[in-house]
Amino acid sequence: EAQAAGLQEETPVLDVHLLGSVICSQAVWPHMKAAGFGRILMTTSTSGIYGNFGQANYGAAKAGLIGLMNVLQIEGAKNDIRVNALCPSAATRMTEGLMPESVLALLTPESVTPAALFLVSDDAPRRTILSACAGGYARVVIQETAGVFLPEGERTPEAIAARFDEICDLSTAMHCEEPGGPGMR
């Protein structure tokens, strides 16, 4: 019973924050495709990118939007449909009590709006996650290290453990636009 009740609490959050974007994207997609032009902006969250205590459902939905953005951008590229994500920091009911009032006062919608407008403009990038916080703007990227290749017969948990520092060496990290680890490069 507890699991069923928990799922009932989780579902509306997923419906609003993930499925709402899926449904809206499906509604506009054929029109954008026919026009040979379109812009879609997903609203992700630091809870989806970095995690946050007590927000598993919300964080999962917001992380799901990044996957949705990536797939829709690939599918829409040939029709100049550009899909991006905005990661705003704003003073909301969810952030009340988490930060001092002086900080919340800086987290205005007006400081986020320019980023949103850029991401849907004619000059919008493609497949970009843009963070907007109190007048600060930064690109958020998913990176992959160069990693290591283990030949067949050496692919064991122990071999991975022995080379884990090398696998995780961020000095070799690169921004990836498509999948492909060390074995595929």
Model region roles, listed by residue range:
Residues 1-11, 54-57, 96, 100, ...:
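Conserved mid-core segment of classical short-chain dehydrogenase/reductases
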Residues 50, 66, 71-81, 122-124:
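Active-site-adjacent segment of SDR/Rossmann-fold oxidoreductases
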Residues 25, 61:
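Active-site helix of classical SDR
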